[in-house]
Amino acid sequence: MFVRILNSEMELATGCTEPGAVALTAAEAGAALRKAGGTRVEAVTVRASINIIKNAMSAGIPGTSYQGMDYAAAIGAVGGDPVHLLEVMNYVPREQMEEAAALVKAGKVKVEVAQVPQKLYVEVVVTADGHTGRAVVRDLHTNVVLVEQDGVATLDKQHAGPAAAGDSDVVTPEQIAEFLTVRSIWDYCTEELDPLHDPIDIIRSAVQVNTTISNEGLSKEYGLAIGRNLELNCRKGLMTRDLTTNAMVIASAGADARMAGAPVSVVANSGSGNQGITATMPVVATARWLDIDEEKMLRAVTLSNLIAIRIKAKFGRLSNLCGATVAATGAACGIAYLLGGGYHEVCCTIQNMVGNITGMVCDGAKADCALKISTCVNAACQAAAMGVRGVRVQSTDGIVEHNVEYTLDNFATLSTNGTSDSVILDLMLNKHLPETD
């Protein structure tokens, strides 16, 4: 089940996953249009949930100077092949990219807010020659639930759950939340897993692919160039080049490249490339800094990604809170393990993370995501260093509880119910009593 969860929640993507989901939906609609008899796309209408619009508004389109969901929709509709899923824009020829850009500049692409209960919802309607194609993606970034040609459904799984609507190997958030605990993840990664022989290819890919995008981010001035600037600060003596700063440099550089639209793939975690980078690269950086062998590094990276997946299962695919805080909590656990920590120390590390960076808001996917990631990675290294010494935020403080699972549930509640004072106070006043032996 652990490998199935990893394969379900980790996948290749190019660029930000929200524009990717828009492009995929548009590609499905465009393909339906062509089957209905339409030729050259004349107009595109996108209706999406607020969270999708927020995260797609300022994100760069891979391999172009464009940004935003209108370009993603046009590119997907004009030249996208839905078989490529979240990498759909990677395979669109330059001529069709230019055709799509012309549609946007001519005002032929409209973006509207969809009044729907789902946080992840994209609907695209494409028209040409009196024909229409329509597609809907919902709940998961690649979960296509409806495709229509001239109003006639050729695929309709709107009343099915995400696993039924998409790949049969998809594991639902409810299944993940029920199966994964910090204890079960720890036992699997440290005792049951054989990293060199078990089929954890997605973890190996995450290390390789996300290292590539981090190196890309250090090679050029992408976005705010947080990784390169941290590196420069070290060379100038403004910062110390230590384990923590090294992890910050490597993780933020990957996000620099991704948010700027570098045409380089990433292995995402829970639908987010930045979370994939954040859950993987600080752990890889720490392992290499400490000269840790590959087997232990793979255990640590698996631990990190599974902890992030466990949190996101209740946190929500898209949220008002920054997903880097979730992924960095996973990274902190992986780092604590590499520093010699056991299960108790990993639990202390989680308590330190929730007691520190909880509440960082998500105000869209954009260049300064790399800045937030560097902050979260700094916190992760600090939390791990404290945790391996048994130092932890106490259950008398804030939303931290005596049991790490309750703490993570409180963390998720802030994501799903908002971060108002009333919600925070309610969590503080209604903590679980410690169990007695």
Model-derived segments and spans:
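Acidic-glycine-rich active-site phosphate/pyrophosphate-binding loop
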Residues: M1-R4, G38-I52, D242-G261, D293-I311, ...
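Glycine/charged-rich beta-loop-alpha catalytic/anionic-binding loops adjacent to active sites
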Residues: F2-E11, N51-A59, A257-A268, A308-L318, ...
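Conserved phosphate/anionic-ligand binding catalytic regions in large, soluble enzymes, centered on
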Residues: L12-E28, V264-M281, G323-V326
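A structural signal for small-residue-enriched, beta-sheet-centric alpha/beta enzyme cores
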Residues: A13-T17, A48-N55, R138-T142, V147-A163, ...
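Early transmembrane hairpin of solute transport permeases
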Residues: A23-V126
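Hydrophobic alpha-helical bundle architecture
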Residues: A36, T286-R299, L303, I309-T375, ...
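Flexible, glycine/charged-enriched surface loops at secondary-structure junctions
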Residues: A36-A43, H84-M89, V111-E112, H197-I203, ...
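Signature of multi-pass transmembrane helix bundles
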Residues: K105-G261, L425-D437
